[in-house]
Amino acid sequence: MFSFNLLTIVSSIVNLLALAWIIKRYFLGAIIRIMNERREKIEAAMKEAEKKLQEAEDLRKQREAQLAQARDEAAKIIKEAVDTAEKMKRDITAKAEEEAEKIIVKAHEIATAERKRVLETAKKEVLAFSRLIIKEFFKRFLPVEAEELLISQFAESLDSAIANIKSDNIEEVKFISPDNVSSQLKKKIEDKLRSLLPGNWKFIFDVDPSIGLGFKLFIGEFLIDHSLDYHLSQIYETIREVENI
C-alpha cells in the first residue's frame, strides 16, 4: 500500500511538473503577454481619460476666460454706448440751446431792424408832413418876404458857428436855400461870410427845394445845417429820447 501511494505521488508530481512545463511553454507567455497588453491598454485608456479630462478642464477654463472676456467686452460696449448716448444728449442739448440762442438773437436783430425801419419810416413821414404844414403856413399866413427874412436872420447868427472853423485851406463856400432868393440877400450873405472867413475862396449859391425852409452852408468840408429838416429831426430825436422809444 505504501508503494502504491508513493508511486501515485511521484506520478502526480511528474504530471504536475509536466503540466507546469507545458503551461509555461505554451500558455504562460501568452497569458503574460495578454495581461501586459491589457495592462498597457488600461494604462493607455487611463492616460487618454486623464488627457481628455485635462482637455475638458482646459476647455472649461478657456470658456470661462472667454465668458469673462465677453462679459468685460459687453460691459465695455454698454459703457461706451451709454457714454456715447450721454455725449450725444449733451451735444444735442448744447446744439439746441445754441440754435435757440441764435434764433433769439436773430429774432432780436430782425425786431430791432424792423423797429428801426418803422421808426425811420415814421420819421420821414412826420418830417414830410411837418415840412408840408410849415410851408403851407408860410404861404398862407406870412408875407412872401418872410422866408428871406428867416434866412437873413439865420445868416446873421453865423458868428458863433463859424468862429471855430479854420479858414486857411478853404477853396469853396456853398450856400443852399430851398428857393431862389433876391440878389440883395445873396450879396448880404456873401458879405457876411467874407467878413467871417478871410481868404480868396469861391462863393456858390445853390437851390434845393427839398430843404423846405432855412439853409445849408458848406464851408469846405464843414456843414452848418439850418434847414427845416435838420431842426425837425433834432426835435424828433429829442422826443424819442424823452419817451425812451
From Swiss-Prot:
The listed locations are: Cell inner membrane
GO MF annotations, alphabetized: proton-transporting ATP synthase activity, rotational mechanism; proton-transporting ATPase activity, rotational mechanism
Q: Name one Pfam family in it.
A: ATP-synt_B
GO CC annotations, alphabetized: plasma membrane; proton-transporting ATP synthase complex
Q: What keywords is this UniProt entry annotated with?
A: ATP synthesis, Cell inner membrane, Cell membrane, CF(0), Hydrogen ion transport, Ion transport, Membrane, Transmembrane, Transmembrane helix, Transport
Top-level taxon of the source organism: Bacteria
Q: What are the transmembrane regions? A: 3-23
Q: What does the record say about its membrane topology?
A: Single-pass membrane protein
HAMAP family referenced in this protein's UniProt entry, alphabetically:
ATP_synth_b_bprime
- To which protein family does this belong? Belongs to the ATPase B chain family.
Which purpose does this protein serve, as stated in its record?
A: F(1)F(0) ATP synthase produces ATP from ADP in the presence of a proton or sodium gradient. F-type ATPases consist of two structural domains, F(1) containing the extramembraneous catalytic core and F(0) containing the membrane proton channel, linked together by a central stalk and a peripheral stalk. During catalysis, ATP synthesis in the catalytic domain of F(1) is coupled via a rotary mechanism of the central stalk subunits to proton translocation.
Q: Which NCBIfam families match?
A: ATP_synt_b
Self-association and partners: F-type ATPases have 2 components, F(1) - the catalytic core - and F(0) - the membrane proton channel. F(1) has five subunits: alpha(3), beta(3), gamma(1), delta(1), epsilon(1). F(0) has three main subunits: a(1), b(2) and c(10-14). The alpha and beta chains form an alternating ring which encloses part of the gamma chain. F(1) is attached to F(0) by a central stalk formed by the gamma and epsilon chains, while a peripheral stalk is formed by the delta and b chains.
Q: What is the name of the protein in this document?
A: ATP synthase subunit b
